[in-house]
Amino acid sequence: VNVALKPVLPTPALGAERLALLARLTEGLAPAELYWISAYSAALASLATRIPGHSGLAVVADTPAPERAAERLSIVYGSQTGNSKRVAEQLAKKAEDAGLSVRLLRAGAYPLRELAQERHLVVVISSQGDGDPPDDAIGFVEFIAGKRAPKLPQLKFAVLGLGDSSYPKYCAVSRDLDARLAALGATRFAPLGEADVDFETVATEWSQAALETARQALNATAPANVRHASPLHAVSATPQHSRDNPYPAAVLENQRIVSRDSDRDVRHIELSLEGSGLRYEAGDALGVWPQNPPVLVDQWLSALKLDGAQEVERDGRRLPLARWLGREREITRLTRPLLAAHAELTGNRDLQRVLEPEQKAALAALLESHQPIDLLREFPAAWDADKLVAALRPMTPRLYSIASSPKLVGEDEVHLTVGVVEYQAHGSTHYGAASSFLAAAGDDAAVPVFIEQNERFRLPADGSRDVIMIGPGTGIAPFRAFVQERQATGASGRNWLFFGNRHFSQDFLYQVEWQEALRGGALHRLDLAFSRDQAQKHYVQQRLRENGRELYAWLREGAHLYVCGDATHMAKDVHEALLDVAATHGGLSADDAKAWLAELLQQGRYARDVY
């Protein structure tokens, strides 16, 4: 049973200035970190005043750092979408059960000054887009890569990287981190692990092997003797429905929200969570398990001359081939392993050549521009049904930024903003698995969903803080939720939205809602950039520069800034625009501007939900 309790706060013993400082320092922290601070503060108070009943309380300061570090396994994760965090949490739980003293931290919360005393360290980290670290891990990665990193001759470490092999810089962050730690004198106690999009099997096997080595190194005792240096996480009820057990959500509404003249299809979709037990907050994502378009499954069977009713056994399950292609395997994404298998079957020299190490750019371009159906038609091959299922990547869920606040629409429904992927290329119709599935979902459909928390993309706890939101295209989704939340909670801070798309008359998503929000005071500023309405294209980053003086003033006064949308181009262009704003209107040097933005990221005042 989930019961929302309003905390009863004691009369503050701090002055206004110290109270404000405390609010700034704790803003954006995860529940586990707040619990730790609470225990730490209580322990300090006990030691200072010797309050009766506070005997035997363990605090981090009660033993020398090297001694504590030698007795524990530190697990640090850097996660953008939650996968690395999930793997790290599972590893921490297994290590705890095995009798190890464990410290689990997100990379952004890791105390870098303690790295020199660390003895046993595991890092689980993902690589984003063009080999970039997750936002919350930038400081951690840059410190280890930089000149201030200490020599680490006493450290034993292991690194697991999560990535997507369709990108040229697959697992680049973990590879660089692994090499750098070794260069600093540290010793691997497990080889570098690399897990593709279907990461579960690799991550599980790597974790088991790494944990066994760690147990031997730390001489793990029985679980009953475990003593943690710091709490792993707050105790919370496990939801009935999760990634592995999604809830079949009924469709309440599925509405096209671009004009009939638009060459794009964007949907506003409302789903019912009634009876699911799922709870979310503004800023979270909804995981959707998609189904491939039936027409595409038929095209595959036709191109391969295979029978959809033929049963195939894989992963302990025996299913018809059509079911494997429809629900269990990725058939809209061309991957390097599938391309390699197909090239071997066809014996085609051109396909084999693009897989050579010096052809990384050509391979990346091919994987980006083609879908598997193009390959099957252009380079026919005699695929066996069993080998085909084995070669295809397992289906993975897609994450959509939630476009509603439960405080306004209620806890029993959730809204999405979905850009439908469907276009012609190479003589075929290219589909997006999840977006096509959602676009076709009618009143009788059940959409398998789960909640993916995004703790680093939260509104400020202090409702008087100003908020700046940058969300072109479907990146507008979480900011619809943010404005709803601010409206429902009566937040007094100002809200400034930057939105961009192609055409004002065709693609102004939620136009009526934003106009009403402006009139009603829920939105204080709205700056728009429509790229195709004039000869010279206008984008949101230009609006940032044009409003740079006021934008910088808001940030200097404590505003929180959020970015959502395309990671490949938009997010990087926006970041560059923010650097320009800091240099132009703050008088900062290039290095100081970078340091300023890095500090905002570290403080949680600059947050990105990019994909």
Pin down the residues of each PLM region:
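FNR-like FAD-binding dehydrogenase module
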Residues: 1-611
